[in-house]
């Protein structure tokens, strides 16, 4: 049983909390609760979807999400999924620098009757700072052992390559921890990513269009 009124109230509170930022948008991780009824409620409240598989992309499309209201992040991605995400106009978030070549190599996928053939003008890359991610005296996660994301050197190189291939608007994403209930998590994550944004802007000259603070607001079970 789900509390629709509670879901709508919480979504409205979150939106109001960030009303000072006109570019703010909440992306709900479909994997968390792949329920089309809940997705429709969140769509009605102005949220987008965060997808990591073909199934989640298809569900988002079936619920009426399209374009930049969908963000696609995957770390072991078949070409078909990249092509489908591009077909929907989703923001593609690259987990590995080798994915650039994968995108560039896709020219035609018969089963989708869709051509890609070029790098999207808006693209995102997932960052992994390495080491340990600590809040206060607690270790929240160990990005150094994570399979997700690019190093500082890799993401800088990736931005340069993507810029040369026609990308114009860049995003930065990081997945350092999930279900955190401390107030320290997002300020620390934001500090890491905004400092990286300045560094990448200075080194590559790209336009940093957005930063995705992932991980989700935790639930005190």
Segments the model singles out, each with a brief description of its role:
Residues 1-91, 97-102, 106-121, 160-164, ...:
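A charged N-terminal "starter" segment
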Residues 6, 95, 150, 154:
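Soluble or luminal CAZymes and related metallo-dependent hydrolases
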Residues 70-75, 128, 177-178:
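A signal for specific C-terminal beta-sheet/loop modules enriched in small/flexible residues
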Residues 122-128:
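ATP-grasp fold ATP-binding core
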Residues 129-221:
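Active-site loop/helix belt of alpha/beta enzymes
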């Amino acid at each position: 049983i789900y509390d629709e009124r509670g879901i709508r109230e919480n979504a409205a509170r979150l939106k109001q909390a960030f009303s000072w930022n006109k570019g703010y948008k909440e992306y709900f991780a479909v994997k968390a609760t792949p329920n089309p009824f809940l997705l429709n409620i969140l769509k009605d409240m102005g949220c987008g979807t965060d997808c990591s598989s073909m199934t989640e992309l298809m569900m988002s499309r079936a619920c009426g999400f399209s374009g930049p209201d969908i963000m696609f992040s995957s770390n072991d991605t078949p070409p078909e999924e990249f092509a489908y995400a591009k077909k929907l106009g989703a923001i593609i978030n690259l987990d590995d620098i080798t994915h650039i070549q994968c995108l560039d190599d896709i020219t035609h996928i018969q089963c989708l009757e869709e051509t890609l053939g070029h790098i999207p003008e808006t693209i995102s890359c997932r960052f992994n700072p390495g080491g340990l991610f600590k809040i206060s005296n607690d270790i929240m996660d160990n990005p150094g052992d994570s399979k997700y994301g690019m190093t500082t050197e890799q993401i800088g190189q990736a931005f340069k390559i993507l810029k040369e291939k026609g990308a114009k608007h860049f995003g930065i994403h990081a997945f350092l921890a999930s279900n955190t209930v401390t107030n320290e998590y997002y300020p620390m994550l934001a500090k890491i990513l905004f400092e990286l944004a300045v560094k990448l802007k200075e080194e590559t000259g790209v336009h940093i269009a957005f930063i995705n603070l992932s991980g989700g607001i935790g639930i005190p079970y």
